[in-house]
Amino acid sequence: GRNLAEDGYNLGMKYQCVEFIKRYYFEYYNHKMPDTYGNAKDFYDNKLKDGEMNVKRGLLQFSNPSFKKPSVGDIIIFKPSLLNPYGHVAIISKVDESAIEIIQQNVWKKTRESFNLININNLWYIESKRIIGRLSLPE
């Protein structure tokens, strides 16, 4: 069933990846997304340029690659695939000069996963063809 915060804010379907990131942002950052619905793939807006505000989510959107280095707490967005038409979202739990670690819910693999991080011509690439971008709280 659907998981709601005490004030009625829609966190999403229990145990899904979207519910995890929305619950994390609500409990840890006290952040409510203006648009509370959608699948993971809906969190990335293809019409936005790197670093623009994603109004539906109330967060800055960065592409992969991006001029801005990923940060702990950023939401990573994975594009849909043949086996997963909904896409996937996760949270960056660790960043260093050459890798990021994510934490995630509702995956067959591990709840934590690492990806290489490369800087080429002042652009930060998270090495995965599945990662289309990320969302970040405005500073």
What are these regions (language model features)?
Residues G1-L48:
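N-terminal capping segments
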Residues C17, I21-Y25, A40-K41, L59, ...:
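Generic intrinsically disordered, low-complexity segments enriched for polar/acidic and small residues
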Residues L82-E139:
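Aromatic- and glycine-rich peptidoglycan recognition patches
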